[in-house]
Amino acid sequence: MAKIIGIDLGTTNSVVAVMEGGEPKVIANEEGGRTTPSVVGFTKSGERLVGQVAKRQAITNPENTIYSIKRFMGRRQNEVNDEMKMVPYKVKQQGDHIVVEAQGKDYTAPEVSAMILQKLKKAAEDYLGTSVTEAVITVPAYFNDAQRQATKDAGKIAGLDVKRIVNEPTAAALAYGLDKKKDETIAVYDFGGGTFDISILEVGEGVIEVKSTNGDTHLGGDNLDQKIVDWLIDEFKKDEGLDLRAKGNEMALQRLKDAAERAKIELSTALETEINLPFITADATGPKHLVKKLTRAKLEQLVEDILQRSIEPCKKAMADAGVDASKIDEVVLVGGQTRMPRIQEIVKQLFGKEPHRGVNPDEVVAIGAAVQAGVLAGEVKDLLLLDVTPLTLSIETLGGVATPMIPRNTTIPTKKTETFSTAGDSQTEVEVHVLQGERPMAGQNRTLGKFKLSGIPPAPRGVPQIEVTFDIDANGILNVTAKDTATGKDQKITITSSSGLSKEEVERMAKEAEAHSAEDKAKRDEIEARNQLDNLVYNIEKMLKENGDKVSGEEKAEVETALADAKKTLEGTPTAEELNAAREKLTASSHKLAEAMYKANAAAGAAPAGEPAPGEPQAEQKKDDGVIDAEYVDVDEKK
């Protein structure tokens, strides 16, 4: 049976895992890393780089290197004004969705995420030795419907059938609770690169039930990095009188971001670090260098207001779950940012206990996704996951009021039907306006979709009976139906295009991604064939130089012609097939050369006339000269 992989598609890093022999296993990427930076770079030559190689060239190519794309998934421009200021690449609105620009071409957020997913998919295929077409992908628990749908679209573009979207804290609980026999109430505190989530769950006896979830999709490690960058810029301006925010300093800003992230990571274990950036900029007096010491205490002072933003969602989640901190048995930390000592202190103060450190915060979400994939594939038995919807789902009623249909933290899948009526006399159609959010008025919440139910028989207001049904599946994807009970007419909407991409656009992008994947393979094949031919040319030239005098002019000329042809091929832009053909031709010539050399060597080794033939006493005596006695060792016995 084909494997279903589990993917943690993160803001900063992504991880892929799979169930093997009943155990979840994290799969290393092509570079050997267990985590893959969620970075995509576009070079001038049209090459697309993903992961560590993309991250490495970000400093010299900041405007065409896309990172933290998860912050733009399923979002509109007015929702990401702060995020847009944090990145060096261009972000703009295009229709209903956001696009980023790289090398003059526009890409949607799901398209860029799909490039990261393709790399993880390939790593899994290389490891498993078979094609992979199905996956479970995780999202922050507080992702809304549009963000979830954008994630599913990214999977589809990457050639993956997304069998389930799982909340990240829930996935962490799956990994944590896999072997738990006793009942426990756990809190999963997930502070990632771009989002913050808190979930309260009950774990035990093969059942993992989410009681509540809360969070902030504008809060993450990126915000801490930005605080350090802002501090460095202000300090540099104070010292040198130069503003690194000025236009033309894009490369310097990228260097600052990289240095800020490194310093933040170092200060999780060290008390002080030095940020040293030579030649950060220059003025009329010459080059300028940035050298600054940053202590852990100063870092904590800089970011304290950001860290405090994680406390209120935790309190709300506990209130919604009907528990207080004393009832929480374990606090599981997720996300690399939770290695920061100050975050661990905040968690300890909030929940009154030391956080659990038995899981790897970078890998636990992908491991949980692999466990859920194992459940869907039938590899993991006796494990039931009961998740919740993170935000209230409502419809707009008279006066612009948001009337809740499914409250937040309702266990999913779920279905709810309510009866509504018309607001005016002789009204023949009603508009159903579907909303998501916690605000009392429709205009303050996010629109998921609108549709009209027409053909209602004219009647006084309040008489027609319109049944509205909200149905959420296990992925948190919503279907809404409105039905006139008198006529039986109904209208249905599946909130699936809320990522801003139509089905046709997703399919087009999937085809483009597939074509690009084929291009990538052709490029890899071409590089491999080029390297093989280049090596062969080098070796034959060396052999000809050392042994050219031992073969006839005709044989030598034939090889030199083949060498010239091979070099000419290498100078152009040949395909892998053309390179392989040149290599085969050169190999055939080299075989003839080798054969001629062996013959020449054999002839040179024949005994000259008048000397004793081999086997005669003198020859035997000569052969024995310089022989050293040694003990015989049977190598096999040593094995």
Swiss-Prot record:
Q: Which keywords does this Swiss-Prot/TrEMBL entry list?
A: ATP-binding, Chaperone, Nucleotide-binding, Phosphoprotein, Stress response
Feature: compositional bias, Low complexity: 601-618
Highest taxon of the lineage: Bacteria
InterPro entries reported in the protein's UniProt record? ATPase_NBD, Chaperone_DnaK, Heat_shock_70_CS, HSP70_C_sf, HSP70_peptide-bd_sf, Hsp_70_fam
Induction is noted as: By stress conditions e.g. heat shock.
- PANTHER family with a match to the protein in the record: HEAT SHOCK PROTEIN 70KDA (PTHR19375)
User: Family assignment?
Assistant: Belongs to the heat shock protein 70 family.
Purpose of the protein: Acts as a chaperone.
**NCBIfam families, per this entry?**
PRK00290.1, PRK05183.1, prok_dnaK
| This protein's name | Chaperone protein DnaK
Query: What organism is this sequence from?
Result: Acidobacterium capsulatum (strain ATCC 51196 / DSM 11244 / BCRC 80197 / JCM 7670 / NBRC 15755 / NCIMB 13165 / 161)
